[in-house]
Swiss-Prot record:
GO terms for molecular function: ATP binding; metal ion binding; ribosomal S6-glutamic acid ligase activity. This is Probable alpha-L-glutamate ligase. InterPro entries: ATP-grasp, ATP-grasp_RimK-type, ATP_grasp_subdomain_1, RimK, Rimk_N, Rp_bS6_RimK/Lys_biosynth_LsyX. Its EC number is 6.3.2.-. One of its GO terms (cellular component) is cytoplasm. Binds 2 magnesium or manganese ions per subunit. Residues 104-287 form the ATP-grasp domain. Mg(2+) 1 binds at residues 248, 260. Mn(2+) 2 binds at residues 260, 262. Its cofactor is Mg(2+); Mn(2+). Mn(2+) 1 binds at residues 248, 260. The lineage of its organism: Bacteria, Pseudomonadati, Pseudomonadota, Gammaproteobacteria, Vibrionales. Keywords: ATP-binding, Ligase, Magnesium, Manganese, Metal-binding, Nucleotide-binding, Protein biosynthesis. One of its GO terms (biological process) is translation.
C-alpha cells in the first residue's frame, strides 16, 4: 500500500517510527507537510498538489496534525477523504477533539466521567463560577492551550479570582475544573486503536509540579488499568469518533475521569515505557480497515 503521513517534521520520533513501521511491513511511506499542500476543489475530480505534483494513488493517510495547524491540516485531510482515501482518523473527529469545550460537551452527552467543569468568557460573578466547580483549589485552563501550557492550579479562592480576572483581561475564553487531589499529580495515558486499549502508562508530575505532561518534565511508568478504566477510555475515543487516540484519565474516588482525548498521541513516551511496537499496530489497523473500505468502494462502483 501507499501510505501518506501528514506531518510537518519528518525527524520527529512519531513520524520516523510510523515511516519505519510502514516500510517494515512492505508499504511505501510518503511524508506530506500539510502546510505545503494546495487543493483543487471541484465537483468532478478534486485533487491535492504538493511540490508541483498531484498527490495520487494513496491507499491511506495517517494524520499527525499539530494543534497550531488544525484548521488547514483538517482541510487537507478532508480533501483526501473527498478523494476516497482511507484516513486513520477522520477530519471531523480531529476537529471535535481539538475543541476542548466541544469535546467535554460530547463526553457529557455520552455520560463519560470527567471533572466538574465551568466555561466562561466574561463571568459577572467570578466567586459563583469558582463555587460551581467545588471551590479552591481548582484548575484554570486557557481553551487554546496544549502540552500543559496555559494551565494554572489556583490553591486559594483569592488566587483563583486573580487568575480568572487576569485571563479575562486578555479576552481569553477559560475553563475552570475541580482539582482531583487524590490523583496525586498523576494521570494515565491509554492508547486506543479501534475499540481496544492496546497500551497504557502512568505519567507522574515532577516535584513541585501538578501537570503530568512529559513535555513538562513528568515521568512515565507501566501501569495496569481496571476494566472500568479500559471501558471509559474506549468510550471517550468513540465519543470523539477517533479510531486512534491517546486518552488521558485521572483516578478519582468516584471512578475514572477523562481529562483529554488526543487525536495525534505521541509514540515516544509510551513505546519506551511499554516496549510495544505501537507504530506497527497502527499500520496493522490500516491494513485491516483500508482494505475493507476499498472492498466496499468496489461494490458500489
Amino acid at each position: 500500500m501507499k501510505i501518506g503521513i501528514l506531518s510537518q517534521n519528518e525527524t520527529l520520533y512519531s513520524t520516523r517510527r510510523l515511516r519505519e513501521a510502514c516500510e517494515a511491513r512492505g508499504h511505501e511511506a510518503v511524508i506530506i507537510n500539510a502546510l505545503r499542500c494546495y487543493m483543487n476543489i471541484n465537483s468532478v475530480q478534486p485533487s491535492i498538489h504538493f511540490e508541483g505534483n498531484d498527490l495520487t494513488g494513496f491507499d491511506a493517510i495517517i494524520p499527525r496534525i499539530g494543534a497550531d495547524i488544525t484548521f488547514y491540516g483538517c482541510s487537507v485531510l478532508r480533501q483526501f477523504e473527498m478523494m476516497d482515501v482511507f484516513s486513520v482518523n477522520q477530519s471531523i473527529a480531529i476537529s471535535r477533539s481539538r475543541d476542548k469545550l466541544r469535546s467535554l460537551q460530547l463526553l457529557s452527552r455520552k455520560g463519560v466521567g470527567m471533572p466538574i467543569t465551568g466555561f466562561a468568557s466574561k463571568p459577572d460573578d467570578v466567586p459563583d463560577l469558582i463555587k460551581m466547580v467545588g471551590g479552591a483549589p481548582l484548575v484554570i485552563k486557557l481553551l487554546e492551550g496544549t502540552q500543559g501550557i496555559g494551565v494554572v492550579l489556583a490553591e486559594t479562592q483569592t488566587a483563583a479570582e486573580s487568575v480568572i480576572e487576569a485571563f479575562m483581561g486578555l479576552k481569553a475564553n477559560i475553563m475552570v475544573q475541580e482539582y482531583i487531589k487524590e490523583a496525586g499529580g498523576a494521570d494515565i495515558r491509554c492508547f486506543v486503536i479501534g475499540d481496544k486499549v492496546i497500551a497504557t502508562m502512568k505519567r507522574q508530575a515532577a516535584d513541585g509540579e501538578f501537570r503530568s505532561n512529559l513535555h513538562r518534565g513528568g515521568s512515565a511508568s507501566l501501569v495496569r488499568i481496571t476494566p472500568e478504566e479500559r471501558k471509559t477510555a474506549v468510550a471517550a475515543a468513540k465519543a470523539m469518533g477517533l479510531s486512534v487516540a491517546g486518552v488521558d484519565l485521572l483516578r478519582s474516588e468516584r471512578g475514572p475521569l477523562i481529562m483529554e482525548v488526543n487525536s495525534s498521541p505521541g509514540l515516544e513516551g509510551i513505546e519506551a515505557a511499554t516496549e510495544k511496537d505501537i507504530a506497527g499496530m497502527i499500520i496493522e489497523y490500516i491494513e485491516k480497515n483500508a482494505a475493507k473500505k476499498n472492498r466496499r468502494h468496489l461494490q458500489y462502483q
